């Protein structure tokens, strides 16, 4: 199912309901993002003459950390399988300085988009790819005597590998005995009897980790050069010993890749990134420039001016082709404790017409976060201890007390929102998680007294609270 089909099925109200399953409160932010998403679907249905005139209304989320800014954007991208990339504005530097190039956010988005499209296409060819992979695996488990190849190899081929190297193995001699053996292996393979056997397979070597490091240190051009050079020579292969279970996955991916048109994959990946992509720019308040900032102000303003043309719409070169950023939805977010949105350069402010102020979390919100979402923290800890054969039970009073402590600690020290619950629950259940394998009990009840016993000594000491909770 494509993301356009998914959006067709979901109204803004239904999108908000889906977000409610994971995120408590922040109704205004959910509505704005849901409307922005639905507008993208509406735009796809318009005549081409007016479609190009309608650009996404970018969103600026304002609110303290831990209230759900990132989670709203990430969840909505998952709901409709839209390409989504999260970047931190503080990682970027002006052109000419050491740091990440702002264009890398678009390249990251295209990588995600191509991967999504590839996953969908692999599902379409799954049956044929699995059949081909099984044939290869059977031949590896029951090899034959290959006919000797008499073709000589010139020195350049010996050095770089043949440019027209066939993927298929050399012609083989198959007698009746080998056919019978392979038939038996095929039956055992399909019944999972050989899953733990060891087999040697050829896999493509991963790219040099040095180039991966360069992607994160601002030398994106160098990693781009490596991508270009990698296409000039055939990929090197190395032999690995793996289980049959793992070999099935490796050979399936290899066979599926052969059945997918790489040019079509790149074109569709770029199109989806352009039309459906979402880029979340976090900590944008950290690059807001204020008067009297000196060199730091100049640098921050420079980053804003580098981001501006991408948000406005420009052509960015990637290894898959050129990407037009005009119709990508940008969602920026920041706490704006030390600055305000008006500290951003006017041109950039104008590119984020929808402003949403997210609410601070209340004690009641903390209680709901602990109990209501599908991925609620308490449900997660229950599932963890269930693997040890222990039913973990929280009384209502215990959960209320945890919510009260989380709210109070946020009030007394730095407000880190819902992330405070992670710290408190980890401290509360630390001993239980450590001793669980040795505990011979079917169920354990966490009461209000237990919460007070574990957390009260820390709560009464302000210094300990700041360091531990």
From Swiss-Prot:
Domain of life the protein comes from:
Bacteria
Q: Where in the cell is it found?
A: Cytoplasm
- Binding of ATP occurs at 24, 66-71, 282, 347, 419
Question: What SUPFAM superfamilies is this protein classified in?
Answer: P-loop containing nucleoside triphosphate hydrolases
Which CDD domains does the entry mention? RecA-like_HslU (cd19498)
Cite the residue spans of the region called Disordered.
159-179
Example of a GO biological process term = protein unfolding
Q: Which InterPro entries match?
A: AAA+_ATPase (IPR003593), ATP-dep_Clp_protease_ClpX (IPR050052), ATPase_AAA_core (IPR003959), Clp_ATPase_C (IPR019489), HslU (IPR004491), P-loop_NTPase (IPR027417)
The Gene Ontology terms for molecular function here are: ATP binding; ATP hydrolysis activity; peptidase activity; proteasome-activating activity
Cellular component, GO annotation: HslUV protease complex
Q: Which purpose does this protein serve, as stated in its record? A: ATPase subunit of a proteasome-like degradation complex; this subunit has chaperone activity. The binding of ATP and its subsequent hydrolysis by HslU are essential for unfolding of protein substrates subsequently hydrolyzed by HslV. HslU recognizes the N-terminal part of its protein substrates and unfolds these before they are guided to HslV for hydrolysis.
Concerning its family, UniProt says: Belongs to the ClpX chaperone family. HslU subfamily.
Its subunit composition reads:
A double ring-shaped homohexamer of HslV is capped on each side by a ring-shaped HslU homohexamer. The assembly of the HslU/HslV complex is dependent on binding of ATP.
Q: What is this protein called?
A: ATP-dependent protease ATPase subunit HslU
């Amino acid at each position: 199912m494509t993301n356009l089909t998914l959006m067709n099925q979901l109204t803004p109200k239904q999108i908000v309901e889906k977000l409610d399953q994971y995120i408590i409160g922040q109704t205004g932010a959910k509505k704005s993002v849901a409307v922005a998403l639905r507008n993208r679907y509406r735009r796809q249905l318009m005549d081409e003459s007016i479609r190009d005139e309608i650009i996404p209304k970018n969103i600026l989320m304002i609110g303290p950390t831990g209230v759900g800014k990132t989670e709203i954007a990430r969840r909505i991208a998952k709901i409709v399988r839209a390409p989504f990339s999260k970047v931190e504005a503080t990682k970027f530097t002006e052109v000419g300085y050491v740091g990440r190039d702002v264009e890398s956010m678009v390249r990251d988005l295209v990588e995600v988009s191509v991967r999504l499209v590839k996953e969908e296409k692999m599902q379409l060819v799954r049956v044929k790819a699995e059949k081909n992979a099984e044939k290869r695996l059977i031949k590896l488990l029951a090899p034959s005597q290959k006919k000797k190849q008499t073709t000589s190899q010139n020195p350049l081929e010996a050095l770089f590998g043949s440019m027209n190297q066939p993927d298929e193995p050399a012609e083989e001699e198959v007698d009746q005995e080998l056919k019978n053996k392979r038939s038996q292996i095929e039956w055992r393979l399909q019944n999972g009897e050989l899953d733990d056997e060891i087999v040697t397979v050829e896999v493509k070597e991963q790219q040099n980790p040095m180039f991966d490091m360069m992607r994160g240190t601002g030398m994106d051009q160098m990693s781009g050069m490596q991508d270009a050079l990698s296409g000039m020579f055939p990929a090197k292969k190395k032999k690995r010993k793996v289980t049959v279970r793992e070999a099935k996955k490796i050979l399936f991916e290899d066979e599926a890749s052969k059945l997918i048109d790489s040019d079509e994959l790149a074109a569709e990946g770029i199109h989806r990134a352009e039309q459906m992509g979402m880029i979340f720019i976090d900590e944008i308040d950290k690059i807001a420039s204020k008067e009297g900032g000196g060199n730091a102000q100049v640098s921050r303003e420079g980053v804003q001016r580098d981001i501006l043309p991408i948000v406005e719409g420009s052509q960015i070169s990637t290894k898959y082709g050129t990407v037009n950023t005009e119709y990508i939805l940008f969602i920026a977010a920041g706490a704006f404790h030390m600055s305000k949105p008006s500290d951003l350069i006017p041109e950039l402010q104008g590119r984020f017409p929808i402003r949403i102020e997210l609410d601070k979390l209340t004690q009641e919100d903390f209680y709901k976060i602990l109990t209501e979402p599908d991925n609620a923290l308490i449900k997660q800890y229950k599932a963890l201890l269930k693997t040890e054969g222990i039913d973990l039970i929280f009384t209502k009073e215990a959960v209320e007390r945890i919510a009260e402590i989380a709210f109070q600690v946020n009030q007394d020290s730095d407000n880190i929102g819902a992330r405070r619950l992670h710290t408190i629950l980890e401290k509360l259940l630390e001993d239980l998680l450590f001793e669980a394998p040795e505990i011979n009990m079917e169920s354990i009840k966490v009461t209000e007294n237990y919460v007070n016993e574990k957390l009260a000594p820390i709560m009464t000491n302000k210094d300990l609270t700041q360091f531990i909770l």
